[in-house]
Swiss-Prot record:
Cited function: Sterol glycosyltransferase responsible for the glycosylation of ergosterol to form ergosterol-glucoside.
Biological process annotations from GO: carbohydrate metabolic process; lipid glycosylation; sterol biosynthetic process; sterol metabolic process
Ranges of biased composition (kind: Low complexity): 190-222
Catalytically driven reaction(s): a sterol + UDP-alpha-D-glucose = a sterol 3-beta-D-glucoside + UDP + H(+); ergosterol + UDP-alpha-D-glucose = ergosteryl 3-beta-D-glucoside + UDP + H(+)
Feature: compositional bias, Polar residues: 1501-1512
Protein name: Sterol 3-beta-glucosyltransferase
Alphabetized CDD domains for the sequence: GT1_Gtf-like, PH-GRAM2_AGT26
Domain PH: 359-520
Primary residence: cytoplasm
Keywords: Cytoplasm, Glycosyltransferase, Lipid biosynthesis, Lipid metabolism, Membrane, Repeat, Steroid biosynthesis, Steroid metabolism, Sterol biosynthesis, Sterol metabolism, Transferase
Comp. bias (Acidic residues): 156-169, 1467-1493
């Protein structure tokens, strides 16, 4: 502990009484007061989650204890720390402290004359002499161990840090002295490390002249300080260093690439393969470091005589926050970062036969003010919805999620400059979601222990005020974005600006962040995906450091300045070498005598920032001139340095840094006065601000930078602190990689720094010249040359015969044009002219590349484009043309209808076919391709028999498993990206900055973002076994993520759920009774509503109560909307809420509601109406009971359909996008994840021997095997159904595996017996795992449940569906529309028999089922659902906060009179339903929604809603 800390710490208690008297406050006992303060929870960093868990505890001493004492020390130290323990004393405060010590008897104990030649140790003799004089104050000092007399200087981190702090304070008047070695006392320069002001080469007149330091001593100092504090340096034998140059020796000695330190958010995960300290391990380390030294020298052009000083983890702050490393050498500062593969360019020639989703960075719905009419795209006034797909190099806009071959618009990311949200004021009004569940619970209680209704409105308001960054207004619903209005963002390219709309600011930020990351990668990295910066020490003009945390919570801080825990921002300005600058501009600057370009970079050091800055300061300061300001500055600008700066960074708007600069600018009084009138006044600087129209971006104004950073702390829109970071509940988990992996990465060839600029980014002069032509001239030329092109010969761009284009210039021009038209890096092979047959034939140019077949219209006003991946082409065959002189060709596309092309000559058609087939042959050369039986045509039966005989022995049979390792890898990568998005959302809420984050793909360690605490997740559902099974699969996936999962459902499934290691809680209801009722009423009708109200009223009341009890202690709630209670429970607990279901439940024009499926399609308006109608009918039936339950048990006000905002709740559809493609009118928070399969037969399952023999005999008899089972359906006449099934099987001459579950429920008489005797063609198997059975059979007949439908489609077998109720009708229609099965409206022996024959022999149905199966096998629904939960978590939390604000305001203006008992309500009466009153205000509510207001509350929290007043 430092001298000054011990002085103030020791004197606090004895002087407290006098200090209190001095300040006029009553005297309190020192010891008791101190202990009381320490035990006060408000003064500790310990906080609790909603479930009562302790996340962090701080047992360290409170180094800021003096701040609790008022009076003298309060005035003395009122601004001692600038940001929660990150600053240091300024000159004035140190002066006061020095004067106080001089006047006291402590002055002789103060360390004197710190310097290179003197020791910092106290003289024990002098202390004993003072004690002998009887000085009681010194005796007190001795007792409290003011100074450790027996301590010795060592390399330990604590002692070294304490010494540094002592000497920094004691030597505040000697800023220029240079320190010696690490084991000796160091001085601290006032301009850099002491008071953290700007350090420039321009020394002020008041700064003391530094002591001249010999050049030889600089090297000694550098060598001594290179070993970072706390690092364990490997001792390298001298024989291993022989023959190495100085740079290599210093790298081997000082580089520790695997060194990682824990911090506030950084957690180090123990490596599974720890490093061994044997000789072999040592040799591997040396070899790795030599490889690193070789690469550093080659890439950064380092000298052999340079000296490596140390490496540090640092984040580059530009348009993104990029994780990387800073390497310090004697002559330069180096920054190096490996971009992740997701954001790095891949070799386009490497074509992978895998799902296209692997190359997708992000996808979703976007609004665009343009419409497609036929083949023409026109700008419109109205907004139209499109499906957008963001890939590594393109943003493609499609008319729907199923039509991905014909983009409406393709934007090349390489030509984009930046993207940003247009209405930024809307972001400032956005609600701040409470991340820390214990500290910022909306209701102030612990959801895990009790109903959180204890807090008052004042407490909630104070919490929300603290989260709203000190805004003067109170948090009401007018201040909070309800996400109802559209949010627009713009994408600025070199030639045009595009504007897109999103449904919420969360979605808009996600689009902007993902696009910004891609733009950063394309413009700021070399072709190897590496970001490089080299700043020569001799060219550094200015540097400074600033702390990141606020000083509001200094008393709660646990960070130790001496332990290098301080997150620091370091800004460096240097003289740049712009290689991209034109020679003409350079000459102009030279003749005008202008100064060189000043570049600047910003780094964030989460750890070891102080250590880095001290080392960096020692490297820079010796080269500072001793002359005055002007001479020093001129000498810098006029000197020609031999060292050259290197950077892959390009100029950009740098919105992230500019936002911080703008916020740190001093606010004038006039501007403050304007701000009081509101936020609609436009700033004059914004009016006259120049628009950026070229990649030559203007750099950040230097004067504004200097004015902004006069303080030693970086001010953010919302002050950050250590506690705020911990409240994010996210950690950067770092795990070390193997040495072998790092060595392999460094063995790969790397480009030199002169090759860092990508050739694909540079524009071609000829291309620019061509683009200057007007659209009219292009159209005239296109029409004029149609005849010539129609009869033109093919063009080949590879050496393959007579059509080869010989001129290099023509080949290069065609290649550039092709890449420009389709925004691809693929290599062009051939081009042709022809027609694409759409609604009408479209004339254009056809391209064949290594990866795609492309088409571009050449007709004026027609913008048709086609990009068809080669991997989707299954067959190319000639066909007849539509006219006599035309020559047709047909492309058979996987999973889609056929595409027809027409050519003007047979030679063009034949050459196209030949080239495409050659590409397909090369593409599939490594595959062991064997046609499926359905692909053999007339030989189908023979091939089917051969296949069955190969796999007839089920004990030895191994079903060919699809290798999904690549798909799982990409799905896990998407989960990692979703965690990053969750952290970005939380960081935005905490700091007010939208910070895109890129994690480095380091060869030394892996970093991933993970929640720092395990969430208690409750899955609430009702229904049959098929309704519960998907939730078990999801629960298993969430448990692997580290969370605690509980399924709340009927008692019947409790034991089954527990076998999977999941928690279980019981809710009311009998699934058998419910299904019996649903089968009786297979559609929505008046009788259904009447009978449901009479039969299930008491059950609904019990369901609501038991559901509320089962969800206690939850942190996240995921519910099937059929359970009815989840949205209200989440509102009461203040926790994020998701819905998950298997059937369409969201308003859309694409699909009707599952309960209103028409016999024939009736269009989008009817589909949308069915959803609105069902929502109102469903709510009308349960609203009375629900509102009574809300008031009496949940302590929530009544609600209505509008206030529930069900359409804004995040929704997860556990259905494959192949079966339920996401509609373009789905909001951003609606996700179609894929099926949640629970593979019960993939483990040690052993089928019954009778079943195995039955299947063997069917194969020998060459009979098809079908499965018939209707799950847990309850029917009236089970015997008649069984007879019809038996007759149909005999009629179709197939073998049947029967699961006769329809007679095993409720009908106790027939439960254990068979109604009729089954023939030998039928085997009654009972329940068999679908994932084991379905791949071994030919067709399946079932009821159309979502799970069973998914299992049959994944197996790729034709499906016959006989629906009974609910979503079964919807899936029967969908399967029939896809052509993969048959829907039975009526089940008889004849209809079922005919369907069995068609399903087992129709090759079109068989083929379509196989194609759907191939798509589903690429999906991983559980992983996609986890990704969606992470990505939408903060959006969901925000919705709950909005509702909580409404509820608190409602209670404030509608208090319950004291002493008045709540009246009892009759449960059989509907008088409690306030829908009639609420419906009267729905029109007003909708108008308020348009104005981005919510539920009738004005800005002052006053209720103006007529529905609220009338209902009470």
């Amino acid at each position: 502990m430092s001298f000054y800390k011990k002085v103030t710490r020791g004197l606090a208690t004895p002087l407290q009484g006098s200090i209190n008297l001095f300040s006029g406050s009553p005297n309190v006992s020192g010891d008791e007061g101190t202990d009381a303060d320490n035990e006060n929870p408000e003064h500790r960093t310990t906080y609790h989650s909603l479930s009562g868990r302790v996340n962090h505890d701080d047992d360290d001493e409170d180094v800021a204890k003096l701040e609790d004492i008022v009076g003298f020390f309060t005035g003395l130290l009122n601004t001692t720390t600038v940001c929660a323990g990150l600053g240091s004393l300024n000159n004035l405060k140190k002066h006061y402290l020095d004067e106080f010590i001089k006047k006291s008897a402590l002055n002789p104990l103060r360390p004197q004359n710190y310097g290179p030649e003197t020791s910092s140790k106290l003289n024990n003799n002098s202390i004993e002499e003072l004690l002998n004089n009887g000085d009681t104050s010194l005796e007190k000092v001795r007792k409290m161990s003011l100074y450790d007399f027996d301590e010795h200087t060592s390399d330990s981190e604590e002692e070294d840090s304490a010494d540094k702090e002592e000497e920094s304070i004691a030597e505040n008047l000697k800023p220029g002295k240079s320190g010696k070695a690490r084991n000796h006392p160091r001085d601290s320069r006032t301009t850099a490390t002491l008071i953290t002001t700007q350090i420039t080469r321009t020394k002020t007149a008041t700064t003391a002249t530094p002591t001249p330091t010999p050049t030889s001593s600089v090297d000694t100092d550098v060598t001594d300080v290179t070993e970072p504090i706390g690092k364990v340096t490997t001792k390298i034998p001298e024989e291993q260093l022989q023959g190495l140059n100085p740079l290599q020796k210093s790298v081997v000695k000082n580089l520790d690439p695997h060194h990682v330190r824990e911090g506030v958010l950084i957690k180090v995960k123990n490596s599974e393969t720890p490093l061994k300290n044997d000789r072999q391990e040592l040799l591997e380390k040396i070899q790795l470091r030599l490889k690193i030294a070789d690469k550093l020298q080659r890439v950064f052009d380092l000298s052999d005589e340079d000296t490596f000083c140390g490496n540090y983890s640092a984040w580059l702050i530009k348009d993104v926050l990029l994780q990387g490393h800073v390497y310090l050498t004697k002559d330069a500062l180096l920054y190096f970062a490996f971009l992740p593969k997701r954001f790095s360019l891949e070799n386009s020639s490497e074509v992978l036969d895998e799902d296209n989703s692997s190359s997708i960075v992000y996808s979703g719905n976007l609004g665009l003010k343009s419409a497609k009419y036929g083949e023409v795209v026109l700008n419109t006034v109205l907004q139209h919805r499109y499906w957008a797909v963001l890939r590594a190099e393109t943003l493609s806009i499609y008319s729907s999620s199923t039509n991905l071959y014909f983009p409406v618009l393709v934007i090349d990311i390489k030509k984009c400059l930046y993207t940003e949200i247009i209405d930024k004021e809307k972001l400032n009004r956005e609600a701040i979601s409470p991340v820390n569940r214990g500290t910022y619970s909306p209701n102030g209680g612990l959801s895990g222990t009790a109903t959180p209704r204890a807090s008052t409105l004042e407490n909630t308001a104070s919490e929300l005020n603290s989260m709203l960054s000190g805004d003067s207004y109170s948090p009401t619903e007018d201040n909070v974005e309800t996400t109802a209005s559209t949010v627009w963002f713009k994408l600025v390219t070199k030639k045009k600006t595009y504007k897109f709309s999103c449904d919420s600011s969360f979605s808009a930020r996600q689009w902007c962040n993902n696009i910004t990351k891609l733009i950063f990668q394309h413009n700021n990295a070399n072709s190897n995906g590496e970001v490089l910066i080299k700043i020569p020490i001799s060219k550094i003009a200015e540097y400074n450091k600033r702390a990141l945390f606020s000083e509001e919570e200094e008393e709660d801080r646990t960070l130790d300045v001496t332990m290098n825990d301080i997150p620091l921002n370091v800004t460096i300005k240097y003289l740049g070498d712009n290689d991209n600058e034109r020679k003409r501009d350079k000459l102009k600057r030279k003749y005008k005598g202008e100064e060189p370009t000043i570049e600047e970079v910003h780094f964030l050091f989460p750890k070891s920032g102080v250590e880095f800055f001290e080392t960096f300061d020692k490297l820079v300061n010796p080269v500072v001139s001793d002359n005055d300001n002007q001479s020093s500055k001129s000498s810098i600008t006029s000197t020609n340095f031999s060292e050259k700066a290197i950077s892959t960074l390009s100029k950009s708007p740098n919105h992230l840094v500019q936002t911080v600069l703008d916020f740190n600018k001093p606010v004038d009084d006039d501007i403050s006065a304007f701000k009081k009138f509101g936020t609609t006044i436009t700033s004059p600087t914004r009016i006259f601000k120049a628009t950026i129209t070229s990649p030559e971006m203007t750099s950040i104004d230097e004067t504004s930078l200097r004015d902004s950073f006069d303080s030693d702390r970086l001010h953010l829109p919302r002050d950050m602190s250590e506690r705020a970071l911990k409240n994010l509940e996210v950690s950067f988990v770092t795990s070390l990689k193997k040495l072998e992996d790092a060595s392999k990465r460094y063995e790969k060839p790397h480009m030199e720094h002169s090759q860092t600029n990508l050739a694909s980014i540079l524009s071609d002069p000829s291309e620019v010249k061509k683009e200057s032509k007007t659209a009219i001239s292009k159209s005239i030329k296109a029409l004029y040359s149609v005849g010539t092109h129609w009869s033109a010969t093919p063009n080949h761009y590879f050496e393959l015969g007579k059509y080869y284009v010989n001129k290099v210039q023509d080949r290069d021009s065609s290649q550039r044009n092709f890449q420009s038209h389709f925004s691809t890096n693929s290599k062009l092979l051939a081009s042709y002219y022809g027609h694409l047959l759409r609604t009408v034939p479209v004339y254009g140019k056809i391209y064949v590349s290594e990866t795609d077949v492309c088409f571009r219209s050449l007709l004026p006003g027609v913008s048709t484009k086609m990009v068809l991946p080669m991997t989707d082409i299954e067959e190319v065959r000639a066909s007849r043309g539509s006219r006599l002189t035309y020559h047709g060709l047909r492309l058979i596309v996987r999973g889609s209808e056929e595409l027809d092309l027409e050519f003007g000559s047979s030679k063009s058609r034949d050459d196209f076919q030949k080239v495409v087939l050659s590409v397909l042959e090369r593409l599939h050369s490594k595959e062991g391709f064997r046609p499926e039986p359905y692909q053999w045509g007339s030989n189908f039966e023979v091939e089917l028999y051969k296949t069955r005989m190969e796999y007839s022995d089920s004990e030895n049979r191994e079903i060919q498993q699809y290798d999904n390792s690549i798909d799982i890898k990409f799905a896990e990568k998407k989960i990692e990206m979703a965690r990053v998005r969750m952290f970005e959302d939380r960081l935005m809420a905490a700091s007010g900055l939208d910070v895109p984050i890129i994690l480095e793909d380091s060869p030394f360690f892996k970093t991933e973002l993970r929640p720092s605490t395990s969430y208690n997740i409750t899955l609430l559902t009702i229904g049959s076994r098929g309704d519960v099974q998907p939730y078990i699969a999801l629960g298993k996936g969430l448990v692997k993520e580290g969370h605690n999962v509980t399924i709340a459902t009927h008692a019947e499934f409790g034991d089954w759920i527990k076998t999977f290691g999941l928690g279980f809680k019981e809710i009311a209801g009998d699934p058998a009774e419910l299904m019996s009722f649903m089968v009786t009423h297979n559609s929505m009708s008046v009788g259904f509503l009447k009978n449901a109200q009479q039969k299930f009223r008491s059950w609904i009341s019990k369901l609501l109560t038991t559901s509320w009890e089962a969800c206690q202690g939850s942190d996240i709630l995921i519910e099937s909307p059929s359970a009815m209670s989840g949205i209200h429970i989440a509102e009461a607990l203040g926790i994020p809420y998701f819905r998950a279901f298997t059937m369409p439940w969201t308003r859309t024009r694409a699909y009707p509601h599952a309960f209103f499926v028409p016999e024939q399609k009736k269009g989008g308006s009817y589909n949308y109406l069915t959803h609105v109608l069902f929502e109102n009918i469903f709510w009308k039936g349960i609203s009375g009971q629900v509102n009574k339950w809300r008031v009496e048990e949940l302590d929530l006000p009544k609600t209505n359909l509008y206030r529930l905002q069900q359409t804004r709740v995040p929704f997860l559809y556990n259905v494959s996008p192949a079966i339920l493609p996401p509609s373009v009118d789905f909001p951003d928070w609606i996700k179609v994840t894929g099926y949640w399969f629970l593979d019960e037969g993939s483990g040690d399952y052993k089928p019954p021997e009778e079943l195995v023999q039955f299947m063997k005999k069917a194969s020998r008899d060459k009979k098809k095997i079908v499965y018939i089972g209707f799950g847990s359906i309850v029917v009236k006449d089970a015997k008649s159904l069984t007879k019809a099934v038996v007759s149909a099987v005999r009629r179709a001459d197939v073998r049947c595996i029967l699961n006769k579950g329809w007679s095993d429920r409720l009908d106790n008489k027939d439960k254990n017996e068979i109604e009729i005797e089954l023939p030998p063609e039928i085997y009654n198997s009972g329940t068999i795992p679908h994932d084991w059975l379905f791949p071994r059979i030919d067709a399946a007949v079932h009821h159309g449940g979502s799970g069973t439908t998914g299992a049959t489609m994944r197996a790729g077998i034709p499906t016959i569906i006989k629906p009974f109720f609910g979503d079964q009708f919807f899936y029967a229609t969908r399967i029939e529309d896809l052509g993969a099965g048959i829907a039975l409206k009526k089940l008889t022996a004849k209809t079922l028999g005919d369907a069995l024959v068609k399903a087992t022999h129709d090759l079109k149905i068989i083929d379509k089922a196989k194609r759907v199966s191939q798509q589903i096998k690429h999906e991983h629904g559980v992983l996609s659902a986890i990704e969606s939960i992470y990505s939408e978590l903060e959006y969901s939390r925000n919705l709950i906060l909005i509702k909580d604000i409404h509820n608190q305001n409602y209670k404030r203006h509608h208090p319950v009179p004291s002493g008045v008992q709540t009246p009892a309500y009759d449960t059989d009466s509907d008088d409690y339903d306030d829908d009639e009153d609420d419906d009267e205000s729905d029109k007003d509510d909708e108008e308020e929604e348009e104005e981005n207001s919510y539920d009738g509350y004005d800005g002052n929290g006053v209720n103006n809603s007529p529905s609220q007043n009338s209902s009470n």
